[in-house]
Swiss-Prot record:
It comes from Mus musculus. PROSITE patterns: TSP1. This is Thrombospondin type-1 domain-containing protein 7A. The keyword Nucleus does not apply. The keyword Secreted applies.
């Protein structure tokens, strides 16, 4: 209390000091004011004052004291504005600079806040005046604490500003809660005790115990005892009025004469030894005596730890009457009085030596994170406690310390290091289905790579200076437990580049016959060439264009030329000799072109043959008119051979027939067509064929700068050369001579390349050898080994140095010393020491030299081999110290003497047999009758023989299914990536328990069992989602322009058992996965080809002129378009039907001598299309009319431009992105999304891209973009940990656990992590042996009726199965031989204790009650956080009313506890019995208590009415008022008392069956108003809905249900009739409809 009061006083003093400051300031200001007033007559008050700003930051060169901080100081007017410094008094100017402490970051380790403990919660003064009538939760309070900044190493205060630099100052005060007052709560009374007297008048009592102590100022506990007078049968004899009482034993003391007697005895002994030494002259005898003395001296040295002294103690024996007053011993009639003396051991407290020096600090280095270590000092026991209950103080003391000296080295720091990543592997990402059907050799795309981690000492190079360069490159690994930081990732996603196949354009048309090199035209050898180009460069494989097909083909030809004239168009036909008609010529307009068809300078064609003019005929008015020749058709064959010959045709038609007179007649039909040969070159095509590039070989001609790579990655690689084979190949034949192919176009055969860098194997140095066991070996004969290892951090590559040395080495440890086990050696008991005869000689009946006494013995510490050992070793390893003293008996003449017990006889027979042991009476005891009493002194003891019947039975649940453990594969230090075995056949286990015939648990080996039942089990393997192969791509959805093509997969099998989930399925058809990509169809792939119009066939033939209106036709065919022009006829549906030219038309055949004009030219329409504009076409006159009066008509047609009819706009359109496209060999990773560019006409039709290109429209959209398909990474788990220690050291419920962790979470559609991350397995059943106290014996007072006595108890070895329900069963003590002697957690074994047997008439305290349940302080079931409390109590027992004034106070004891609960108290009432009932308070766990319930809310226990309810048909209600029974109404008086109960009238409803109006149904009508009968007759019902009991009949419910169904039916019909039916919708789907599968719609899909 003193300490607590002191703590409470200190903050109050601080508060007072804080309050003093403003008071002093007020006094100073008031005195200053008075002084100013006094001087007001002589001195004018100043109008200017000095003002100061806050102190700035502490500045200085060094950390710590010595810094300087400044602040601003200025002069200001009293109104606040700043003025000149000269206006203020300079003498009182404040300082603008002061010294300060400069805080640096490293001060954080030296300074910190010291937080004091919170003081007691004090009520807030302002709130305490407003206390409510009823406390609900508690009273608000406040508590304070002391906080100071300290220098940690010196433990001295420092300025607060230093600590505030790093952390704000913690709160000095906080709100707290003072709970409501809690009154004492007690239990119900126990039953009444028996009467205190067996006859006559006595007392009986009953007690109760405390359930909850008073808290927070609550009221105290009521009396825990009630007593009442009881009457028994009258006493036949006088009851004894006196009792013999023994007092407590005195303290153990040593007789006064002992020291003198010992001194005399020592003197005599020395004289005897001297004489004996003189007498003994034999050297051997002297040696024996010397050894014995040394041994005795050692024993005495060991025994000095105990220094046992045996003394004596006495007690008083008095005779008491019933009032507790002493009387003469003669009144207590007894044959033999109790002993008043006995031998005892002098109590010795534990004594220890002085502390030894502190050990060196465990932290010998400097560590910033944990700078402190520990140091230890010890002391030893110099005197062990004897007869004392106090334990020895601690023999070891630890305290934190810091390594001393400035030269302390840095502590070793550790960190994780990693090996290089392994190659990227795609196969771990494959599903089960892909692994079975895929060729895994050429996989690419997203993959997984792994690496190992190992721990190293990161500052090893700083701590050791003699490291070699190799050691610095790679540090040696250390134990992984030393690295505490986050573990680096051991798995990551990677990417294997996918090879991109070479894509080429279509072949161009065959070019003209040209030299292979126009710059070198030696010889006449020429070639016709056709080419194609690479549209998509290949990657991967052999690289560059090695995988591309040949890009050029050649055909030998004759008469090559590099340049030639090309006819552009023919001029008009000019008649000869200036005539207007007749034969003439047409001049060709030509340009000079090269072999690629490009227009060049005309000078280059100077060697070429210039085209000559073409002969023609300008028709005269009466001549036949023919149309111009059509263009030559495509060549029928690309080359000419023996069976094939290329041909081209062209045709013309008759436009007008000739007149009958003098005109040139039209030619026959054969003259209207011309045929010529084409592609006359032979069908022998040659090309250069290239082989793959060879291996890159170092080129010695290039200076080598290759170096071997090191771990730091600094390397350079040399240049090499690659070659490949190039041959000339004839198509469809094979290799031919190289002269057949154009030499100048031969591909290169050699190219430079970079040699891959050589990488040597890099291995860490060996780790240190693992430590051998430093402690001694206990029974483990297995050879101990130590090992070391190293880690490959870089695998060799490209011809680097291989890893050859072993990665793991081990060697045998040196044999550790064998552990010494220690034991206590007990020596012979010394002689039995009695109480000195000088003490007991005055006691009546005492006999000298016999009786009870006490004897001691020496104990020493020995090794198992018998060698000497320190007493400290046995105290630590040899178990409890044997008894040093024991009671002994020197038999007197009247005592019975027996031989020692014999050994037990052998067991013969089955279970249930017994064995015996015997003893016999010795000497004069044979003649004493009392010694022959077998009840007092049994001569035979029996015990049951051990029984060997055992039965085994399973206990507990089955374990998880456990797979057999496999071995981890390690290859050159790099872990192999692969799935570990997680499914298949395993075993599950159930523990077996073995019991003997008495139901006691024994070792399972007794039942010939290894402790388990094994049962095979199956862990189902996960099955991934299985889809079909991709279907073929559908046709492009559009035949012209950009469309889409689709392929799909169907669902074949759903995933189960944690397999990979299915990808996101189509929302329409849940059984399919679609992939959609854009596609492009060339609009000119198929074109309409027309032949010339036929001759106009006149409908009404004028035989004379053969002219007039008619019809002409032509053939229209759909043909496939190629680079060489239309090639072959195809089906018409492949061409666009909207663009199909007309096959017939009306025509007009001119009459002779009429004007003849040519075919109409193309329409001209300027773009962009202007609706206000027009377009036109024209034709040229071919034959002039004979009559000049009949001129040729205007050969121009005009029509307005109409958008989307004869004039169009064009624009680019971009399709949607495709799905992410991966390589066929890829599972995931980087891919490409593509889209197409489309040229769309304004009417929405896709047309050829050339229409948009001719307009020069912008096209800035990217057509490709990169994308990523998330990789399906399966969940990767660590290996199972080792099995943990059993959760229970014994019993049935022990479990072993092993765990695993997720090393790589699943990603994407990878296999998810299993839920089972922990497995349990039952432990083998072991019996639980422990020591257990027996019950205390009754308090035994030796040969007296009351007073101080003793009670004893035994300890026994018991076995149980560890469960709370199992009752422990006693077994032989040998089973507990290896069990430490601890009972209820206490090593101090108490088998005997003093007790008090109350004398008749005494008033005394009963035994302590059991500790109550742990109870928390709660409000509405919520803990307030004040901790739990338990209580026990002692009640007062009264035996005589006259002795009440001698009664002690009842006792209460509390203690704090942790596992508390919230309890509620509420009133409970029984059912009313008449006008009364019982009401009691009950706790929420069902215990009836007194106190705890609020008195104001206690229910009534009596409900009788006053005055009583005497009126007929009335009763007393719960509200204690008179009420009427049912069917009656109350009539109240003016003073609100019941006067009478009036019958309530009823309405009679007559029925058909009974015209007399029997009462069928009665209903009260306004029970508080008079009944009024309605006028008229009562209505008669033929169907009565109510039965005789007033309830509805069954048929009424049926009618109601039928009516409801009918109503629902009518409403439904109305709704269906009025509802407007939906129009059937026809869905159009251009996509190919796939074959559907049955699918059950599982949510996991």
């Amino acid at each position: 209390m003193g300490l607590r009061a002191g703590r409470l006083a200190s903050p109050s003093r601080g508060v007072l000091q804080l309050l003093r400051l403003p008071l002093l300031l007020l006094l100073l200001l008031s005195s200053g004011a008075r002084g100013a007033a006094a001087q007001g007559d002589t001195e004018v008050p100043t109008l200017y004052l000095w003002k100061t700003g806050p102190w700035g930051r502490c500045m200085g060169d060094d950390c710590g004291p010595g810094g300087i901080q400044t602040r601003a100081v200025w002069c200001a007017h009293v109104e606040g504005w700043t003025t000149l410094h000269t206006n203020c008094k300079q003498a009182v100017r404040p300082s603008n600079q002061q010294n300060c402490f400069k805080v640096c970051d490293w001060h954080k380790e030296l300074y910190d806040w010291r937080l004091g403990t919170w003081d007691r919660c004090q009520p807030v003064i302002s709130k305490s005046l407003e206390k409510s009538r009823e406390c609900v939760k508690g009273e608000e309070g406040i508590q304070v604490r002391e906080i100071m900044c300290i220098q940690k190493d010196k433990d001295i205060p420092a300025e607060d500003i230093i600590c505030e630099y790093f952390e704000p100052k913690p709160l000095l005060e906080q709100a707290c809660l003072i709970p409501c007052q809690k009154d004492c709560i007690v239990s119900e009374f126990s039953p009444w005790s028996e009467c205190s007297r067996t006859c006559g008048s006595g007392l009986q009592h009953r007690t109760r115990h405390v359930v909850a102590p008073p808290q927070y100022g609550g009221s105290g506990c009521p009396n825990l005892t009630e007593f009442q007078v009881c009457q028994s049968n009258p006493c036949e004899e006088d009851e004894s009025l006196y009792s013999l009482q023994v007092g407590p034993w005195s303290a153990c003391s040593v007789p006064h004469t002992r020291q003198a007697r010992q001194a005399r005895r020592r003197g005599k002994n020395k004289e005897r030894e001297k004489e004996r030494g003189k007498a003994v002259k034999d050297p051997e005898a002297r040696e024996l005596i010397k050894k014995k003395r040394n041994r005795n001296r050692q024993n005495r040295q060991e025994n000095r730890y105990w220094d046992i002294q045996i003394g004596y103690q006495t007690r008083d024996v008095t005779c008491l009457n019933r009032t507790g007053k002493s009387a003469d011993l003669s009144f207590c009639q007894q044959e033999r009085l109790p002993m008043t003396f006995q031998s005892c051991v002098i109590t010795k407290e534990c004594q220890v030596s002085e502390w030894l020096e502190w050990s060196p600090c465990s932290k010998t280095c400097h560590d910033v994170t944990s700078p402190t270590g520990t140091r230890v000092r010890t002391r030893t026991i110099t005197q062990f406690p004897i007869g004392s209950e106090k334990e020895c103080p601690a023999l070891e003391e630890k305290e934190p310390c810091v390594s001393q000296g400035d030269g302390a080295v840095l502590c070793a720091t550790y960190g994780w290091r990693t090996t290089e990543w392994t190659e990227c592997h795609v196969d771990p990402l494959l599903s089960q289905q892909d692994k079975r059907r895929a060729n895994q050799t050429a996989l690419c795309g997203g993959g997984v790579q792994t690496r190992e981690i190992y721990c190293i000492q990161t500052n090893d190079n700083m701590l050791s200076h003699g490291n070699t360069q190799k050691d610095k490159e790679a540090s040696k690994p250390v134990d992984s437990k030393l690295c505490t930081g986050p573990v680096p990732n051991t798995t990551q996603l990677c990417h294997v580049p996918c090879p991109i196949e070479c894509e080429v354009s279509p072949w161009s048309a065959w070019g003209p016959c040209t030299y292979e090199n126009c710059n070198d035209q030696q010889g006449k050898k020429g070639f016709k060439l056709r080419k194609r180009r690479i549209t998509n460069e290949p990657t991967g494989g052999s690289g560059a264009t090695g995988n591309c097909p040949h890009l050029l083909e050649a055909i030998p030809c004759e008469e090559p030329s590099c340049y030639d004239w090309k006819s552009v168009r023919l001029g008009d036909c000019e008649p000869d000799n200036g005539k207007s008609c007749g034969p003439g010529t047409q001049v060709q307009e030509v340009v000079c072109i090269n072999s690629d068809g490009e227009e060049v300078d005309r000078q280059l064609c100077r060697d070429a043959i210039f085209p000559i003019p073409v002969a023609c005929d300008a028709p005269c008015p009466k001549d036949c008119v023919l149309s111009a020749w059509s263009s030559w058709s495509s060549c029928s064959h690309t080359c000419s051979g023996k069976t094939t010959e290329g041909k081209q045709t062209r045709a013309r038609s008759i436009l007008a027939y000739a007149g009958e007179e003098g005109g040139i007649r039209c030619p026959n039909i054969s003259a209207l067509q011309e045929v010529r040969s084409c592609n006359e070159h032979p069908c022998t095509v040659y090309h250069w064929q290239t082989g793959p590039w060879g291996q890159c070989i170092e080129d010695t001609s290039v200076s080598s700068f290759n170096t071997t790579t090191t771990w730091n990655g600094e390397a350079s690689c040399s240049v090499g050369m690659q070659t490949r084979k190039v041959i000339c190949v004839r198509v469809n034949v094979g290799q031919v001579g190289p002269k057949k192919c154009p030499e100048s176009l031969r591909p290169e055969t050699v190219r430079p390349c970079l040699l891959p860098c050589r990488k040597d194997c890099v291995v860490t140095p060996y780790s240190d050898w693992t430590p051998c066991p430093s402690s001694c070996r206990e029974g483990d004969s297995g050879a101990r080994k130590q090992s070391r290892q190293r880690v490959i951090i870089q695998l060799p590559a490209n011809g680097g140095k291989e890893c050859s040395d072993p990665l793991y080495e081990e060697k045998a440890c040196e044999a550790p010393p064998t552990c010494h086990s220690y034991r206590w050696k007990t020596h012979k008991w010394r002689r039995c020491q009695l109480v000195p005869w000088s003490i007991q000689q005055d006691v009546p009946g005492a006999q000298e030299g016999c009786g009870p006494g006490r004897q001691a013995r020496a104990i020493t510490c020995r090794k198992q081999d018998g060698g000497q050992a320190s007493i400290q070793e046995c105290l630590q390893y040899a178990g409890p110290v044997p008894a040093l003293t024991q009671a002994c008996q020197i038999p007197c003449q009247d005592d019975c003497q027996f031989t020692s017990w014999s050994k037990f006889s052998s067991c013969n027979g089955d279970c249930g047999a017994v064995r015996t042991r015997k003893r016999a009476i010795v000497g004069k005891s044979k003649k004493k009758e009392k010694c022959k009493n077998s009840h007092l002194y049994p001569l035979i003891e029996t015990q049951y023989c051990p029984c060997d019947k055992y039965n085994a039975q399973p206990v507990g649940n089955w374990s998880d299914c456990i797979l057999p453990e496999g071995k981890a594969e390690v290859l050159l230090g790099m872990k192999v990536q692969g799935d570990s075995k997680e499914c298949g056949q395993g075993y599950r286990y159930q523990a077996m328990a073995c019991y003997d015939q008495n139901g006691r648990l024994v070792e399972t080996s007794r039942c010939n069992s290894h402790g388990y039942i094994e049962e095979a089990c199956i862990i189902p393997c996960p099955s991934d989602c299985k889809l079909s192969e991709w279907s073929n791509w559908s046709r492009c959805s559009k035949s012209c322009g950009s469309g889409v093509k689709v392929r799909s997969k169907w669902l074949r099998e759903k995933p189960y058992n944690g397999g990979r989930p299915c990808p996101k399925l189509d929302h329409v058809n849940q059984a399919q996965v679609y992939e959609v990509v854009p596609c492009h169809s060339d609009c000119n792939q198929y074109i309409w080809v027309t032949e010339p119009w036929s001759v106009c066939k006149v409908t009404f033939v004028d035989m004379r002129d053969n002219c007039g209106e008619g019809v002409q036709t032509r053939k229209v065919r759909c043909m496939q378009n190629t680079a060489d022009g239309p090639s072959e006829h195809v089906e018409d549906y492949l061409c666009d039907p909207e663009d199909m030219p007309l096959g017939s038309r009306e025509c007009k055949l001119p009459c002779p001598e009429d004007c003849v004009i040519s075919e109409w030219g193309p329409w001209t329409c300027a773009l962009p299309c202007n609706p206000s504009g027009s377009r036109q076409r024209s034709a040229d006159p071919i034959r002039q009319p004979a009559d000049e009066g009949r001129a040729c008509p205007d050969a121009v047609e005009k029509e307005p431009c109409s958008l989307n009819k004869n004039c169009y706009h064009y624009d680019y359109n971009v399709t949607d992105w495709s799905t992410c496209q991966l390589s066929e060999k890829a599972v995931c990773g980087n891919g490409i999304k593509t889209r197409m560019l489309d040229c769309v006409r304004s009417d929405g039709k896709s047309v050829d891209l050339k229409y948009c290109e001719e307009l020069g429209l912008e096209k800035n959209w990217p057509m490709n973009t990169s994308c990523t398909v998330e990789c399906p990474v399966n969940c990767q788990l660590s290996d199972w940990s080792s099995w943990s220690q059993c959760s229970q050291t014994c019993g049935l419920t022990g479990k072993m656990i092993r765990k695993r962790t997720v090393t790589q979470p699943f990603q994407g559609d990878g296999r998810p992590c299993p839920s089972l991350m922990e497995q349990s397995k039952p432990c083998p059943v072991k019996p639980c042996y422990r020591w257990q106290y027996g019950q205390w014996s009754p308090c035994q007072v030796q040969e007296a009726q009351c007073g101080e006595g003793t009670r004893t108890r035994n300890i026994s070895c018991v076995v149980s199965d560890g469960s709370a329900e199992d009752f422990s069963k006693v077994v032989d003590e040998e089973f507990c031989a290896n069990t430490e002697l601890i009972i209820d957690g206490n090593k101090q074994i108490v088998l005997e204790e003093t007790c008090t047997q109350p004398c008749p008439g005494d008033c005394y305290l009963n035994d302590w009650s059991s500790w109550s349940l742990c109870q928390l302080t709660c409000v509405n079931g919520e803990d307030l956080g004040f901790g739990g409390i338990q209580v026990r109590s002692r009640a007062v027992i009264i035996q005589e009313l006259e002795n009440q004034h001698l009664c002690p106070e009842q006792m209460l004891e509390t203690k704090s506890c942790d596992d508390g609960q919230c309890y509620e108290y509420k009133w409970v009432a029984s059912a009313w019995k008449g006008s009364s009932r019982t009401v009691w308070c009950q706790r929420s766990d069902g215990i009836n208590v007194t106190g705890g319930c609020l008195v104001v809310s206690q229910p009534d226990t009596d409900r009788s009415c006053n005055p009583p309810c005497s009126q007929p048909h009335s009763y007393c209600s719960e509200m204690k008022t008179c009420r009427c029974e049912e069917g009656y109404t109350e009539v109240m008086s003016s003073n609100s008392t019941l006067e009478q109960c009036t019958l309530i009238p009823v309405v009679v409803i007559p029925t058909v069956e009974d015209k007399r109006g029997d009462v069928k149904t009665s209903r009260a009508v306004h029970p508080t108003q008079p009944s009024i009968n309605p006028a008229g007759r009562g209505r008669t019902w033929f169907l009565q809905p109510f039965g005789p009991d007033g309830r509805l009949k069954t048929w009424v419910y049926g009618v109601a249900a039928g009516a409801f169904v009918l109503l629902v039916f009518i409403v439904s019909m109305i709704y269906l009739a009025c509802k407007k039916p939906k129009k059937p919708q026809r869905r159009q789907n251009n996509r190919l409809k796939p074959l559907t599968l049955a699918y059950d719609g599982d949510a996991d899909m």
